[in-house]
């Protein structure tokens, strides 16, 4: 298994994609909304992906809830992370967050999808890229909600990915469109934004981490996703993280500062990433596959899901039905709440 995660164009594989998935550097595939028409088609696409690759790939998606939910029709409408604590008492918020983690994971694993890149551990709602994807503006409250969501995911059999290390919540720029700079003192980042990562790592609740395409100017001139300081010195050595480190999508403008696609990929691997994401640019992905030196990343097998969910059986279960009803209601209440605030 190799260290590259890429994407495919549509609802089913084409001939070129079948060949690309056999490349020894490919170890994963991420799905997007454009790959989804309905649940039956999605299940068949994942089957095609499994059949095309020589080794079992890690199949991933961003199914967080709120505005980031790639699969909607036929799946539970998942609430935005901010909604749990914002409009519920503490006990209800904790219960709903845990059920959301369980239900999201169960619905994805019923499609034979290994991981959803969740939860978001960024603090606060000012960032254009984050907003309601953050659980809370208070680090301890965010950690409590995230821990509940994680326990739900783990109980279903899905591994967790905390993002975006060491914290994307304070920058207003969107790293999908430009390279954000966080100019705050390093001490503030370490004692405010990074605390949630530190505590969840200590509790052994994070199986993987995705760093931010953000330059923390008081620490390093490179984005965290390509920074040996953040990934090796801080994340591995100081925090003792032993799980998988993903790059964020190297096609994002925030990664362009690291050079060509192949240079971005090599820089991220050299900095300490275990798996690099190259999405939404077939030419860029092929360039990475053509130019990266051969490398094995067998540790990625730890991310395979361990759930045994049949979609029909899951949706007939009382737990799913109760969770589906409660989470759909929370999503609707959150919409109404935002309207009263003029958002």
Curated annotation (Swiss-Prot):
InterPro entries associated with the record: Beta_hexosaminidase_bac, Glyco_hydro_3_AS, Glyco_hydro_3_N, Glyco_hydro_3_N_sf, Glycoside_hydrolase_SF, NagZ_Beta-hexosaminidase
Gene3D superfamilies with a match to the protein in the record: Glycoside hydrolase, family 3, N-terminal domain
Enzyme Commission number, as recorded: 3.2.1.52
Compartment annotation: Cytoplasm
Reaction(s) the record says it catalyses: Hydrolysis of terminal non-reducing N-acetyl-D-hexosamine residues in N-acetyl-beta-D-hexosaminides
One of the record's GO cellular component terms: cytoplasm
Protein's GO biological process: carbohydrate metabolic process; cell division; cell wall organization; peptidoglycan biosynthetic process; peptidoglycan turnover; regulation of cell shape
Active-site positions on this chain: 176, 248
Principal place of residence: cytoplasm
Alphabetized Pfam families for the sequence: Glyco_hydro_3
Molecular-function GO terms, alphabetical: beta-N-acetylhexosaminidase activity
Pathway(s) served: Cell wall biogenesis; peptidoglycan recycling
Keywords: Cell cycle, Cell division, Cell shape, Cell wall biogenesis/degradation, Cytoplasm, Glycosidase, Hydrolase, Peptidoglycan synthesis
PANTHER family: BETA-HEXOSAMINIDASE, BETA-HEXOSAMINIDASE-RELATED
Sequence similarity: Belongs to the glycosyl hydrolase 3 family. NagZ subfamily.
Protein name: Beta-hexosaminidase
Species, as recorded: Yersinia pseudotuberculosis serotype IB (strain PB1/+)
Organism ancestry: Bacteria, Pseudomonadati, Pseudomonadota, Gammaproteobacteria, Enterobacterales
